[in-house]
Amino acid sequence: MINIRKTHPLMKIINDALIDLPAPSNISSWWNFGSLLGLCLITQILTGLFLAMHYTPDTSTAFSSVAHICRDVNYGWIIRYLHANGASMFFICLYIHIGRGLYYGSYMFQETWNIGVLLLLMVMATAFVGYVLPWGQMSFWGATVITNLLSAIPYIGSTLVEWIWGGFSVDKATLTRFFAFHFILPFIITALMIVHLLFLHETGSNNPTGIPSNMDMIPFHPYYTIKDILGALLFILTLLTLTLFSPDLLGDPDNYTPANPLSTPAHIKPEWYFLFAYAILRSIPNKLGGVLALLLSILILVLIPMLQTSKQRSMIFRPFSQLLFWTLVADLLTLTWIGGQPVEHPYIIVGQLASILYFLLILVLMPAASIIENKLLKW
């Protein structure tokens, strides 16, 4: 009898992607985060769907509809907090996944990498519009400040901002369209994720050594399915612990105050996962310059394959590059901390230095270190 798994048109696709897929025998736990991101996406879509059933995208009722979900809907509180903290988990997994790609040279699969950067931008856009929906103080002012940055675009800026707002300020029209975007974007992300996997399966996975492993492959199932299930269980445990013990740990207390256009919060700041980019934005005194630096801080990822000067793909045998990589991680953590601090004396200069170091590391120091390491190979 012919195995239906290998012949059925639909089952065959699933089989080739998740069961009989040849995978390198030496990939470590850092390769778990791709499947965890898929799990994050499913969690967010499901919890988001149930929230959307009870949420009303209207300035007069949005805040109270979220309160209604938490108080009156059966298990509404846990759905709401799973969704909010699920977003944080999503970004933790995303940043680790990107870090893994940088460390082990996975960016050399250029199509996969570029679609990954596009996915990152999409997830960031989704998280931003989603943060506006509860219509608390930080939702309103975050939306006002971030959308206002577009006014820095010469000539069309002001018109563009008013077009996005649907009026002369962030109001009912803005909230309604942000809800529409927040609903549609995850499905676009799902489609892009399939394309991301499609390109990955054209080349096969990279591995920690960065050396082709075609002569030493093992089937994905059962070896990596069991490993992914362990990762998924640890992920679920972390998410549930965060949600049930300290659901507001990563949120902003200001968002428990209904949006008030007449009262500005003392410190306007986005969610923690955007703070590094926010710190880069704030470190440049010029509006247009800040916006360009903000964009470049993410889009610089597209340039990374072009900046590859090393003869080795992975950083596993490159001590100088390793040192610079971990300096970059520390720098991003510093920027995240600075982004959450008020704009005053010690923080301003620290933020500016950290921003300069961020671009310097990626554009100059890492390629230079790779060239030095190439020379050392000849010794």
UniProtKB/Swiss-Prot annotation:
Domain of life: Eukaryota
Cofactor(s) needed: heme b
GO biological process: mitochondrial electron transport, ubiquinol to cytochrome c
GO molecular function: metal ion binding; ubiquinol-cytochrome-c reductase activity
Main location: mitochondrion
Transmembrane annotation, as ranges: 33-53, 77-98, 113-133, 178-198, 226-246, 288-308, 320-340, 347-367
UniProt keyword annotations, A-Z: Electron transport, Heme, Iron, Membrane, Metal-binding, Mitochondrion, Mitochondrion inner membrane, Respiratory chain, Transmembrane, Transmembrane helix, Transport, Ubiquinone
Membrane topology: Multi-pass membrane protein
UniProt xrefs under Pfam families: Cytochrom_B_C, Cytochrome_B
Residues holding heme b b562: 83, 182
Family as reported in the entry's similarity comment: Belongs to the cytochrome b family.
Leftover remarks: Heme 1 (or BL or b562) is low-potential and absorbs at about 562 nm, and heme 2 (or BH or b566) is high-potential and absorbs at about 566 nm.
Designated name of the protein: Cytochrome b
Organism: Phocoena phocoena
Gene designation per UniProt: MT-CYB
